[in-house]
């Protein structure tokens, strides 16, 4: 990770960002490259969970946020509004990072009840994602750690905390 300052994400749309970027100059004969792994977190989630509907959306090169919006808001794909797509994007990435109904409600300026319904509909749409995430929480609680795609163990000591909020955090990071 890169922070204070985050040199991995220097703004390009602001004049100050453009000025800062000018100080990075490659050695003679070399170039800098830029790689954007489009929706990499969601693609990995599709692979790890084995959710057929999510995998199919990627195989067919569909707009995953519009596809999710269509499913979650029960509207035909061609009728998904920009707001619905934006909200679905927040749900898609929020799920990956363990967002709660409270967190989603804050992000989208909606009620907790609505946010909870969005999350529930997401898991109805992509049930294997729910099973996969639940299995990670179960593993974390039983073993005190979860295992990454490459076999790295990530300890989650929060599961043993007497503090409810800490245990909830453990579930989100699992």
Where on the chain are the PLM-derived regions?
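Conserved catalytic core of nucleic-acid polymerases
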Residues: 70-174
């Amino acid at each position: 990770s890169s922070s204070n300052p985050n040199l991995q994400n220097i703004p390009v749309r602001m004049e100050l960002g453009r000025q800062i970027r000018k100080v990075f100059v490659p050695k003679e004969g070399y170039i800098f490259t830029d790689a954007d792994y489009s929706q990499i977190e969601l693609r990995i989630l599709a692979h790890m969970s084995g959710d057929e509907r999510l995998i199919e959306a990627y195989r067919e090169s569909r707009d995953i946020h519009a596809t999710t919006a269509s499913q979650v808001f029960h509207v035909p794909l061609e009728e998904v509004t920009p707001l619905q797509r934006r909200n679905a994007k927040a749900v898609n990435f929020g799920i990956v990072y363990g967002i709660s109904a409270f967190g989603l409600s804050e992000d989208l300026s909606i009620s907790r009840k609505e946010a909870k319904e969005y999350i529930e509909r997401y898991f109805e749409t992509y049930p294997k994602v729910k099973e996969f995430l639940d299995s990670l929480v179960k593993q974390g609680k039983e073993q005190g750690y979860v295992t990454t795609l490459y076999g790295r163990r990530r300890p989650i000591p929060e599961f043993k905390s007497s503090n409810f909020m800490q245990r909830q955090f453990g579930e989100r990071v699992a």
